[in-house]
Swiss-Prot record:
Source organism: Roseiflexus sp. (strain RS-1)
SUPFAM superfamilies the record matches: Nucleic acid-binding proteins, Translation proteins SH3-like domain
NCBIfam families: rplB_bact
Biased composition (Basic and acidic residues): 227-239
Subunit structure: Part of the 50S ribosomal subunit. Forms a bridge to the 30S subunit in the 70S ribosome.
Family of this protein: Belongs to the universal ribosomal protein uL2 family.
Protein name (database record): Large ribosomal subunit protein uL2
Start-end of Basic residues biased regions: 249-262
Domain of life, source organism: Bacteria
């Protein structure tokens, strides 16, 4: 997916880049796989903001993606590669031989006309989904399950891939895109290959308005707030923060603090992430 740059005809265009979308083969989505998507604007069921800087954005439909890949042993043909506004990856429309249609994440190298299949007897080929037990060591995988039958929850964004490093007993060892090395139950499903749309990380939005189209509202610096609103706030003019380390809006350390609190799954992590 090459990235297109513009001539600097305006301040917003000067640093803007967009995808060429040349891998997209179908503009209109499959209507039978669409669902309404209601905007939350970062609010929970009480109406309180739980995620800041969210709201607005272009109206979207949700594309129902098959993360489980549970249609075992039934081949499907790739009918189209489509754009999905709800994720960084592209999606592939599959037509199964029994007439069913499903969307999956489009891996790098999957083209219209290719045949994919899921199950323990599937070939080791891009787009096929197999249990980790059946996948050779060193293979790149994505859309990895953490619990058998629950569907893939890891390694799903554009350009992501995990590497299968070892298999021992009931667990397989994976090196994640973050550098974390963790164990996963060996019967969990994973899809062969790397998620496509690799150049997503090279796109520059160029202007604040384009961020608003994505549903992101402005982030205000703590130093620009009043002292009642942020520990860094207040002072006459530009004032130092007045503390040795930066704090969050709620007074907690903002740098170098572990944010993971799930001791139940700690034994499955062999090495912490490096970035």
């Amino acid at each position: 997916m090459p990235v297109k740059k513009y001539k600097p005809t305006s301040p917003g265009r000067r640093n803007m880049s967009v995808s060429t979308f040349e891998e997209i083969t179908k503009k209109e989505p499959e209507r039978s796989l669409l669902e309404p998507l209601r905007k939350k604007a970062g609010r929970n069921n009480y109406g309180r903001i739980t995620v800041r800087h969210r709201g607005g954005g272009h109206k979207r439909h949700y594309r129902r993606i098959d993360f489980k890949r549970d249609k075992i042993g039934v081949p499907a043909k790739v009918a189209a590669i489509e754009y999905d506004p709800n994720r960084s990856a592209r999606i592939a429309l599959l037509h199964y031989v029994d007439g069913e249609k499903r969307y999956i994440l489009a891996p790098l190298g999957l083209n219209v006309g290719d045949t994919v299949m899921s199950g323990p007897d599937a070939d080791i080929r891009v787009g096929n989904a197999l249990p980790l037990r059946q996948i050779p060591l060193g293979t790149q995988v994505h859309n990895v399950e953490l619990e058998k039958g629950r569907g893939g929850v890891m390694v799903r964004s554009a350009g992501a891939a995990a590497q299968l490093m070892a298999k021992e007993g009931n667990y397989a060892t994976l090196r994640m895109p973050s550098g974390e090395v963790r164990r996963v139950f060996i019967e969990c499903m994973a899809t062969i290959g790397q998620v496509g749309n690799l150049d997503h990380q090279n796109i520059r939005l160029g202007k604040a308005g384009r961020k608003r189209w994505l549903g992101r509202r402005p982030e205000v610096r703590g130093a620009a707030m009043n002292p009642r609103d942020h520990p860094h706030g207040g002072g006459e003019g530009r004032a130092p923060r007045g503390m040795p380390t930066p704090k969050t809006k709620w007074g907690k350390p903002a740098r170098g603090v572990k944010t993971r609190h799930n001791p139940r799954t700690d034994p499955f992590i062999i090495r912490r992430r490096t970035r």
